[in-house]
Amino acid sequence: MATIYRNGRFFTGSDKSFAKCIIVQDGLIQYVGDESHPTIEKMKKGNFNEVDMLGRTILPGFIDGHMHLMLLGSSLKQLSLEKCKSLEDIRATIKAYAVTKPSLPRILCRGWMHSMTNGEAFASMIDDLDDRPILIDSKDLHFTWCNSAALQELGVEDKEDPAGGKIHRDENGKTTGLLSETAAQVFAWPHFANVSSMDQKLEAIEEAITAYTAVGCTGMVEMAMDENVWEVLQVLQSRKDLPFRLAAYWLIQPSPNEEKMISQVDRAIELHRKYNLTTSPNCRIAGIKIICDGVVDACTAALQEPYCNGKDPESLWTPDMLRRIVKHADSSDLQCALHAIGDRAIKMAVDTLEAVYKPGKRHRIEHLEMASPTDAKRLGQLGITASIQPVHSDPAILGAWPKLIGNHRASRAFPYNEFHEGGAVLALGSDSPTAPHDPLVNLYTATTRRSARDLENKSVVNEAAILSLATAISAATKGAAYSCFADAYTGSLEVGKTADFVVLDMEWSPGNLLEARVVQTWFEGQKVYAVDC
C-alpha cells in the first residue's frame, strides 16, 4: 500500500525550493512534488495511508561519509577526557572513575589531545593512579598512551617498531608509554579485540548503530575495516535486518615487505567480489584505506615546509610504494581512500591518483586539512572526491595550530570552499569517534566555522571556506552516497530511490542548527527511530 507524506518541507537539493509531499510504496519513492498534483488525486481514489508531517523539514537520511563503527561503539563505554584541559584534569578524572569501577579489568579512556599535556605522554604520569592497565586513545585515534601495566599487558617491550609507527622509548631503549600511528593500530587495537568476547563486540556495534539511527543516519562509510570488525558484522547481519547501509574500506597497514601489503589488498579484492553493490548492497567492501600521514596536533602530518618547532616528518608511505599499491587495487575496481592531512601528503595522494586516473573511478582523499590552492583545484579535474570532516575545524580544538604551523598556514586550513568551487564532489563525515557523530554538529561547523564544543568561543576558522547550508546538507547526503557509489539508490529524495529520510524540527538557518531536533528516522519506508512529539 502506498503512503502519502504531506504537509512537510522536503529538501530537494536547493535551499530556495522544497517539495511539499512525497509518495512511498514498497520502500521506494514514487513521487516528489506538490500536494495538488494529479498523481496525488489519483492516489487518493485507491487504498493509501496518509502521514501529516506537521510542517517539519525532511532531509534525505544522513550518510556519515567517514566513520569507525566498532571504535564508536567501544568508545561509548570508555571514559571521556574531552573536557580535560591539563594533565591535572586528566589525572583527577581517571582517578575518580577508577574508584567507581573496581570490577573493570582495565581502564580505557578516550579524547586525550597532545595540547592537554604539552605534547608529552609518559607512563610515569599516570602509573600511580591505579594498578590496572590504563590505555588512553588520543582524540584523533593516531596514538595510545599507556601506563606501565598496560605496556606489560600489550607485550611491546621487545617488539620492533612497525612500518609507519613507533613504540616510544628512552635513551636506554625502555618503553616510555606512547604508541604512535601504526604501533597503536598493530598492538593496541587488536589487543582490545582479543580481550573482548563476541557478545561484547556485538553489543558495541549495536550501540553504535542505535546512536546513529537516533541522529538521522541511514548510511555509513566505515574507514578502518579489518577482519575483526568484518566478522562481527557478518554475525550481526545473520541475526537481524539492520536499519542502515554500510560501505567499508579495508585498512592497509604499511610494511617493509611489499608482498604483505599486496596480500592485504588481495584480501579486500576477495571480499569485494563476494560482498559488493550487486550481491550485498547494505554491507559491502567498497575499497581500501591507506593512511599517508599523521595529524597536525602531534606534528606528524607531512607538510611542504617544516613545523615552527623544526619538526619535518616524512609521509608514512613512499610515493613509489603508494603508487604500486593503489594501482593494484584500482586494477581490480576497488576504490582507494587516502588519508592525507598535510599539504605534502595531499600532493602525494593527488599525484598518485592522477597516475591511475580513469573517469568514473571515484577515488577519494580523506581530511584534506592543509591542501594547497593548486592541489585543491586538481581534485575536481581528476574526479577525486573530497572527503571532509568539518567537526575537525572547530576552533575550540585548534588553539595550538598557530604555534605549530604559523598564523598564515593556520588561517587557510580546511579550505572546503576551494574543493567545491573547483568541481570536486564533497562527502561530509564525522570521523567518529574522534568527533561527535551527530550530523547537526558537523553541519553547524561547516556552515559557520564556529565552535559547537564551546559556544563561548567566538573564533571563526578560515571564514572564506564557509559552505552554504544546502551545499553542506548535500555533502552529508547525496555527496556521501556518491563517494561510495550508492547515489543510484539513496542520498536524495528522488523518484525511484529508497525512502531513506530524516524528519527534523529545525529552522533553515546555520546559526540555529544546534537547536534542531531529529524527530524520526525512516529506512526503506519503515520508521526505525522516533521521539515523543
Where are these regions (language model features)?
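Divalent metal-binding segments
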Residues: A2-R6, F11-D266, A286, I290-H328, ...
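Short, charged, surface-exposed secondary-structure boundary motifs
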Residues: C146, P256-K260, Q264, A396-A400, ...
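Hydrophobic membrane-embedded alpha-helices
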Residues: G165-G173, A371, R378, L382
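Acidic (Asp/Glu)-rich catalytic clusters
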Residues: L236-K240, H272-S280, K358, L379-Q381
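His/Asp/Glu-enriched, well-ordered alpha-helical/loop segment
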Residues: V326-A337, R344-H363, H367-L368, P373-K377, ...
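Ligand-binding beta-strand-loop-alpha-helix segment within the catalytic cores
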Residues: T385
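Short, Lys/Arg- and Gly-enriched loop/turn segments at beta-strand edges
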Residues: W508-L514
